[in-house]
Amino acid sequence: MNKEIIEVFDNTFPNRDYTIEIVNPEFTSVCPKTGLPDFGTITITYVPDKSCIELKSLKYYFLEFRNAGIFYENITNTILDHLVEACQPKSMTVKTDWNARGGITETVTVSYTAEK
């Protein structure tokens, strides 16, 4: 996944802690075992520091996963790593909720907190 796609902009309220929640209910990737499509909802919750994530670039970043054979756990951790690197938030959580396959659903949650 090309993390260079992710753009940020200056946070105009860096001295105030507030939470931003971004939800993508139409995330797609491919199961690396079966080659079948996977569908899920990605929820990103973060407290920005000096910069915020630009949404159009995030949309294009998510499209990088569309044809990639990658496990749920890898997707979730990769997204967190790339977004933390891009915007260096005070804290961030990425939660992925995957649609049922064979009657089983999966949710993966990973978090980051900046060192003080």
Swiss-Prot record:
Top-level taxonomic group: Bacteria
Catalytically driven reaction(s): 7-aminomethyl-7-carbaguanine + 2 NADP(+) = 7-cyano-7-deazaguanine + 2 NADPH + 3 H(+)
Binding annotation for substrate: 53-55, 72-73
UniProt pathway: tRNA modification; tRNA-queuosine biosynthesis
Any one GO biological process: tRNA modification
Family of the protein in this entry: Belongs to the GTP cyclohydrolase I family. QueF type 1 subfamily.
UniProt xrefs under HAMAP family: QueF_type1
Protein name (Swiss-Prot/TrEMBL): NADPH-dependent 7-cyano-7-deazaguanine reductase
GO CC, any one term: cytoplasm
Keywords: Cytoplasm, NADP, Oxidoreductase, Queuosine biosynthesis
Role: Catalyzes the NADPH-dependent reduction of 7-cyano-7-deazaguanine (preQ0) to 7-aminomethyl-7-deazaguanine (preQ1).
Source organism: Chlorobaculum parvum (strain DSM 263 / NCIMB 8327)
Subcellular localization, as worded in the UniProt entry: Cytoplasm
